[in-house]
Structures are given as structure tokens and as C-alpha cells.
From Swiss-Prot:
Lineage, highest ranks first: Bacteria, Bacillati, Bacillota, Bacilli, Bacillales
Keyword hit for Nucleotide-binding: yes
Annotated binding of ATP, by residue: 39-46
Protein name, per record: UvrABC system protein B
Organism: Bacillus velezensis (strain DSM 23117 / BGSC 10A6 / LMG 26770 / FZB42) (Bacillus amyloliquefaciens subsp. plantarum)
Subunit record text: Forms a heterotetramer with UvrA during the search for lesions. Interacts with UvrC in an incision complex.
Disulfide pattern: none
Keyword Ribosomal protein tagged: no
GO MF, one example: excinuclease ABC activity
Location of the Helicase C-terminal domain: 430-596
Cellular component terms (Gene Ontology): cytoplasm; excinuclease repair complex
Domain Helicase ATP-binding: from-to ranges: 26-181
Family: Belongs to the UvrB family.
Function: The UvrABC repair system catalyzes the recognition and processing of DNA lesions. A damage recognition complex composed of 2 UvrA and 2 UvrB subunits scans DNA for abnormalities. Upon binding of the UvrA(2)B(2) complex to a putative damaged site, the DNA wraps around one UvrB monomer. DNA wrap is dependent on ATP binding by UvrB and probably causes local melting of the DNA helix, facilitating insertion of UvrB beta-hairpin between the DNA strands. Then UvrB probes one DNA strand for the presence of a lesion.
Length: 661
């Protein structure tokens, strides 16, 4: 069993990183439950966390607050740990409409979902890695606190095969069917097996290219080989192979029988209550739906929406904590919460939203009350899994502050860059003043970010600046991911000099060319002008040696004062460090291709945008088809190379091209 983390990097910890790594490692060794790494923008927090993982050598769960960020972290950790198991566990739905009922209009919305096969494969790869080795890092979104099948059941139902093992061919086939593998001799894909005489080929649920060939001689396994599923090329012999279930909700036959009896009993009790309350229509609906599901479970071993019966399948009492990915980890694992000021409130809010929707379904006869137990964890249940947890944020939230009296700071950037200087100027005449500042930046070939409070103000300001000949663009929430990347790219290339937006805090806006961030109406207290938002926004100018922030305000609010003082404190510390070590701040030199680290498709996508999209209208049907086919091929190649962000970019672009065509 491989159990050591091996960090591969041409860099050594620099600046503040060595002391941060040392303190974090010491905290874990001393058994500290909560620690917070308060790292300023651009100080290399991911590298610090990678060093921590290497030193403490524990299986690690890294939680991010959205798929894009999770994908970005996955790419980074994969680079740092190429010889260890770096896995990706996010929701496998490309599109998900949960089942819901609107009583006012008597409208039932069926569950509708499009499952991403690639992500499903990665989820299986993540859970199977946890049972096979200890050097595992799983990058997950909040989907890791949602219900999953029992880890004990999942582990017990693994089919373990070795050469010279005595097992009848038909018994192996039965075992594979029990763990949700389907026999398919024609369309051989993930989660299926095929039989050719004495040879059984199994396509594991956690793979997408290699399958396992088991060769029998009578009732004995003669040889086990790993084979390329597409070409049939033999890749090598195996001494042992473990086939993990094709579903996380697998149940042994005897448990399934017991679960069916329990579901029937709950159904009878529920129908009795409904009849007593005169809910005849709801009772009929519930009976019809549940009996159909039970029939499917008896005959097939599963049914659509089987997760709603997960409490019965795992034989847990009502109200008990569901199994989640966290239960698949060994007891001594470590949790890292990235951008914790956003992620922790997200984890906290999941349970209530889920219960509100399901309660309506239960009340109107679409589900049994036990469906309420198929849910995300309550926050206090999540807390029980915290043995060693590290929160990572430039602006920790109240929960982290409360639980970690002493913050571990990482303020010094390896590049020597300082936090920007801040000017506060009056609101009167702010636009004329801003135009003067923009002109000065344009002359030096630098860029400007402007953040406003309302959509209308953003639009009006954009129009006004365009009228006076400034190259400006406007970033708002309705812009698709693809266009967003293109706008940021154009800003870096100099097609625009100014970018205006309301919320410029979203990931991917760390642009080295930006030397000025202007905050309009900085004294209007609220979500976008809170101390946290202000510090994060100020950080956008910290990638440039000339970085400066101008706040337009008539009074200095409490949030402004905290943000200004914190930035000043950090800057003084950084200047002191640079002076002692003789460092001259250097603007980060980042390839334009790398606009958003999570989406390395920017380069290729730009090519398609310029070559394919404008000419699409003039193309013949055949030519258009050729472009689409080429992109589909590239998308699959990217997915195969585990470059999911690029694959997602190409997929979105494909959809746009198909819609236009």
C-alpha cells in the first residue's frame, strides 16, 4: 500500500511560506483541531497547503465552494503530486432539476438530470482510492456532504481476484451483477462486463480506457491481464485486482429483502395517517409510486431515485446521520477548506434548503417520510468529522475567527510584491477624477478595474467612457463563462484598457496588468462594501508593482477603516521583509494563455472563436459539421487527459456553435 506523499516542484518555500508551513505542521502534530491560514492574495497558499500535506502525510479532503475552483485546485495539486492519488469529487450532474411539487398550481416536476460520465468515473476513482491507499488527496465541492451509500457495504462487496483462485465463471458473473455491473457483449463501456467462452472482460467503474481480462481454466483463474479497451493491446499481467461496485448505493440481497420489508411497513403506516386525514389522492399517489419502486428493487436490485430509500438500505434509524464521502476516509484524515469565508456558510446552508423542498414532496404523497433522511449533513454533523481542519482564506469569516484564536499569517509574496497604496477621495467629481487616472494608466500601458454598486451605474459609466474614446468593457453576471474568459483575455491583451463590474471578487480576476482598482461609492455599507469584500477587491491590485486603489467616499465607514488599516499593516510588514532581504518588487509575468488558471482552454478557444464562429454563417453544412466534429474530438481528448476545464470550455463552445448553426 503506497502511503507517502511525494511533492514535485522546482520551487522551494519562500517569503512567509516556511513559517506558515512550520506552524501548521506543528499545530497538527500537537492535535489542534482548528487552524486558519490567513494568506494574502498571491502568496502561494496552495503551495503551502501542498507542503503541509507532504509533512503530515495524512489522507486529505480539500473542499472548494464551486466546480470551477475545485477544477483549478485539482490541476494544481495534480502538478505538485504526480505520483500520488489526486482525485476529483464533485456533483456528476451537468444539469440537475430535483423533483419538486408546487401545491399552488398542482404541478409536479419530475427529477431531470444529465449525468457527466467522466465525473461519475472520477467519483468512483476517488472512493476506490481511499480503500486502496493512504496517499490520497480528494478535491471536492460541497457535494461531499451529500448522502452516499454505506462505506462498509461498498468495501465488503468488492470482488477480489487473483491468479490460481478457485471460482466458477458463473459465480464471478453473479458477483458482478450483484455489484451493479451489467453484461453487455456489444457496447463495452464503464460499469459493464462481457463474456467470450472462458474469458471474462470487466470494465471497472473507475476507469475509462483500461479493462481487466480474466482468463479461466476450468473453475480456476489462470491469468489476469490489464487490456486497452479500445485497441485490445495487452498492457501487463496483474497479481491481484479489486473490482469496486459500479454504484455507491449497493446492497447485499439479504439486506435488500429486509429493507423492502421496512419500506412496506413504513408505507402502510403512512397510508393509514393519510386516510385518517382525508388525503385520499395523496395516499393513492404514494402507494402507486412506492409499489412500483419496490417491484423494481425486487426484480432489478435498484430503482430510479433509490437514494430516497438510503436510510432503509443501510438499516439506519429515523433521523440518523447519512453516510457521505467523509465516512470513506480513515479516522485520521485532514480537511482543508479553501476560500473558507464562502465555503463554510455554504456548507451550513445546504441542509435547510434540501429539507424545505423534500417536506413538500412528503406532504403531498410523492415520497415517504424516510426520504427526508437522504440529505446533506447538518453543520453540527459536519463538525463531528473535524479532527484536523485547516481554513484557507485571505479574509477569514466569523466561524474561523471564533474557532482559531491565533491566525497563521502568510503575507509576504515570493515576488516581493506589496499590498497596494490606498487613496480615499470625495464622491463629488469622482468620474472626472477617475478619467484622469485612467488616462495616466493608458499612457503607461496598464489596466484599470472599476467596481460600482448597481448594474445601471456600470452600464451608464461604460457608455460614458466609450463616448469619450476609452476602450472599456463591462462584466456582469449574465455573461457566459466563455465570454467572461474572452473579456479578461482582451483586457490583458490591451483590446480594452478598463473593465467595469459590480462583483469583481469571483475567481480568475488576478490580472498582473491591473495597476489601479477604483471603488465607487465605497462608503455605502453592504455586502459588496463589507470589510471582507473590500480587502478582497483591494487584493486585485496586488499583482502589479505599481498597484494602487482609489476609494471614492464622503466618509470613512467602519468597514473601510478596517480594510485600509489591514492593508497598511500588511504593506509595512512586506516592506520590512523586502528591506532586510534586499528584494525589489517585480510585477508578475504571467503568460496571457493563463488568463484563468482553471481554464487553460483560453488559447484554443480564442482560436475557435476567431476562426470558427464568425464564419459559421457562411459555411456549408458539411464544413460546419467538420468544425463541430473536430471540436468534439478535442473535447474528448481533453477529458481523457483529465483537463476537465478545457473539455467544459469546448463543450460550452460546441453548444453555442450548434445553437448558431
Amino acid at each position: 500500500m503506497k502511503d507517502r506523499f511525494e511533492l514535485v516542484s522546482k520551487y522551494q518555500p519562500q517569503g512567509d511560506q516556511p513559517q506558515a508551513i512550520e506552524k501548521l505542521v506543528k499545530g497538527i502534530q500537537e492535535g489542534r483541531k482548528h487552524q486558519t491560514l490567513m494568506g494574502a492574495t498571491g502568496t502561494g497558499k496552495t503551495f503551502t497547503v501542498s507542503n503541509l500535506i507532504k509533512e503530515v502525510n495524512k489522507p486529505t479532503l480539500v473542499i472548494a465552494h464551486n466546480k470551477t475552483l475545485a477544477g483549478q485546485l485539482y490541476s494544481e495539486f495534480k502538478e505538485f503530486f504526480p505520483n500520488n492519488a489526486v482525485e476529483y469529487f464533485v456533483s456528476y450532474y451537468d444539469y440537475y432539476q430535483p423533483e419538486a411539487y408546487v401545491p399552488q398550481t398542482d404541478t409536479f416536476i419530475e427529477k431531470d438530470a444529465s449525468i457527466n460520465d467522466e465525473i461519475d468515473k472520477l467519483r468512483h476513482s476517488a472512493t476506490s482510492s481511499l480503500f486502496e491507499r493512504r496517499d490520497v488527496i480528494i478535491i471536492a465541492s460541497v457535494s461531499c456532504i451529500y448522502g452516499l451509500g454505506s462505506p462498509e457495504e461498498y468495501r465488503e462487496m468488492v470482488v477480489s481476484l487473483r491468479p490460481e483462485m478457485e471460482i466458477e465463471r458463473n459465480e464471478l458473473l453473479r458477483k458482478l451483477v450483484d455489484i451493479q455491473y451489467a453484461r453487455n457483449d456489444i457496447d463495452f463501456q464503464r460499469g459493464t462486463f462481457r463474456v467470450r467462452g472462458d474469458v471474462v472482460e470487466i470494465f471497472p467503474a473507475s476507469r475509462d480506457e483500461h479493462c481487466i481480462r480474466v482468463e479461466f481454466f476450468g473453475d480456476e483463474i489462470e491469468r489476469i491481464r490489464e487490456v486497452d479497451a479500445l485497441t485490445g493491446e495487452i498492457l501487463g499481467d496483474r497479481d491481484h485486482v479489486a473490482i469496486f461496485p459500479a454504484s455507491h448505493f449497493v446492497t447485499r440481497a439479504e439486506k435488500m429483502e429486509k429493507a423492502i420489508l421496512n419500506i412496506e411497513q413504513e408505507l402502510e403506516e403512512r397510508l393509514k395517517v393519510m386516510h385518517e386525514n382525508g388525503k385520499l389522492l395523496e395516499a393513492q399517489r404514494l402507494e402507486q409510486r412506492t409499489r412500483y419502486d419496490l417491484e423494481m428493487m425486487r426484480e432489478m436490485g435498484f430503482c430510479s431515485g433509490i437514494e430516497n430509500y438510503s436510510r432503509h438500505l443501510t438499516l439506519r434509524p429515523p433521523g440518523s446521520t447519512p453516510y457521505t464521502l467523509l465516512d470513506y476516509f480513515p479516522d485520521d484524515f485532514m480537511i482543508v477548506v479553501d476560500e473558507s469565508h464562502v465555503t463554510i456558510p455554504q456548507v451550513r446552508g445546504m441542509f435547510n434548503g434540501d429539507q424545505a423542498r423534500k417536506q413538500v414532496l412528503v406532504d403531498h404523497g410523492f415520497r415517504l417520510p424516510s426520504a427526508l433522511d437522504n440529505r446533506p449533513l447538518r453543520f453540527e454533523e459536519f463538525e463531528k468529522h473535524m479532527h484536523n481542519i485547516v481554513y484557507v482564506s485571505a479574509t477569514p469569516g466569523p466561524y474561523e475567527i471564533e474557532h482559531t484564536p491565533e491566525m497563521i499569517e502568510q503575507i509576504i509574496r515570493p515576488t516581493g510584491l506589496l499590498d497596494p497604496l490606498i487613496d480615499v477621495r470625495p464622491i463629488e467629481g469622482q468620474i472626472d477624477d477617475l478619467i484622469g487616472e485612467i488616462q495616466a494608466r493608458i499612457e503607461r500601458n496598464e489596466r484599470v478595474l472599476v467596481t460600482t454598486l448597481t448594474k445601471k451605474m456600470s452600464e451608464d459609466l461604460t457608455d460614458y467612457l466609450k463616448e469619450i474614446g476609452i476602450k472599456v468593457n463591462y462584466l456582469h453576471s449574465e455573461i457566459k463563462t466563455l465570454e467572461r474568459i474572452e473579456i479578461i483575455r482582451d483586457l490583458r491583451l490591451g483590446k480594452h484598457d478598463v473593465l467595469i463590474g459590480i462583483n469583481l471578487l469571483r475567481e480568475g480576476l488576478d490580472i498582473p496588468e491591473v495597476s489601479l482598482v477604483a471603488i465607487l461609492d465605497a462608503d455605502k455599507e453592504g455586502f459588496l462594501r463589507s470589510e471582507r469584500s473590500l480587502i478582497q477587491t483591494i487584493g486585485r491590485a496586488a499583482r502589479n508593482a505599481e498597484g494602487r486603489v482609489i476609494m471614492y467616499a464622503d466618509k470613512i465607514t467602519n468597514s473601510m477603516e478596517i480594510a485600509i488599516n489591514e492593508t497598511k499593516r500588511r504593506r509595512e510588514q512586506q516592506e520590512r521583509f523586502n528591506e532586510i532581504h534586499g528584494i525589489t518588487p517585480q510585477t508578475i509575468n504571467k503568460e496571457i494563455r493563463d488568463v484563468i488558471r482553471a481554464t487553460q482552454a483560453a488559447e484554443d478557444k480564442e482560436e475557435y472563436k476567431t476562426k470558427a464562429a464568425p464564419k459559421l454563417a457562411k459555411m456549408t453544412k458539411k464544413e460546419r459539421q467538420k468544425v463541430v466534429e473536430q471540436m468534439e474530438h478535442e473535447m474528448k481528448e481533453a477529458a481523457r487527459a483529465l483537463d476537465f476545464e478545457r473539455a467544459a470550455e469546448l463543450r460550452d463552445l460546441l453548444l453555442e456553435l450548434k445553437a448558431e448553426g
